[in-house]
Amino acid sequence: MANVYLFGASGHGKVIKDILNANGIKVEAFVDDNLRVNECAGRKVLHDAGGLSPMIVSIGVNRIRRMVVDRLVAKAGAEGHPLEFATAIHPSAIISPSAKIGEGTVVMAGAVINADAVIGKHCIVNTGATVDHDCVVGDYCHIAPGANVSGGTHIGEGSWIGVGACVIQCLNIGKDSMIGAGSVVVKDIPDGVTAYGNPCKVTTNKSTDNIMINSNLTQSVGGGKEKLFLFEMPAMSFRSRSVKTA
């Protein structure tokens, strides 16, 4: 594989860099909107993604990762540049030969993906997570460290299974939902909710991954006026780093 670019100069990006390096693949550079960031994990940080390929979007928040992929695809199409998304799988991960893994997806150290499981595009199967036989995980999902998803379960696009959560077999978890850390999921979960506990129960109809974010984030890769976005989470809020928008 050619050298890879990582969009997102972040802690998550550092882990992906290590995974690629463990496979003998060099990270050519990071890409990030924050013009104040010029180095990450010993690699330079670029501020324009135009013409850079192959790429992995190294952003942990599902909704932002999806937005960035969409704008990279749109930018490449408008400028006539080829764009390929790479996949990163740690050498210690155990992947069934019959499993399918989509482009842009990252599988971290110690993860297990069993027979006939399907992992969508731009997903994260994090450290020590397991996805068992015949599961279907939609695009832009995140299976957090130590989470266990039992056989035959379907997880909708953009959903987040929290650290150490357990999901019993043959359930359906809707799209854009968040399962809290340590939860035990024993029944289906609808779209767009936050749910946690043992047993796991829906607590709100707004997923905590529904980040309040100005749509301008989708319109540029570097340059323009600086804005500060507010991330809202249950019982807390925190301000993101500043990013560059048109």
Put a short name on every predicted segment.
Residues 17-19, 67-71, 119, 190-191, ...:
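Short amphipathic alpha-helical segments
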Residues 74-132:
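Hydrophobic, well-structured mid-protein blocks that either form specific transmembrane helices
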Residues 3, 7-16, 98, 110-123, ...:
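Short, conserved structural micro-motifs that define repeat-unit consensus positions
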Residues 1-48:
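Hydrophobic, well-ordered beta-alpha structural blocks that scaffold small-molecule cofactor pockets
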Residues 11, 63-64, 184:
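Short alpha-helical
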Residues 17, 35-95:
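Phosphate-bearing ligand-interacting subdomains
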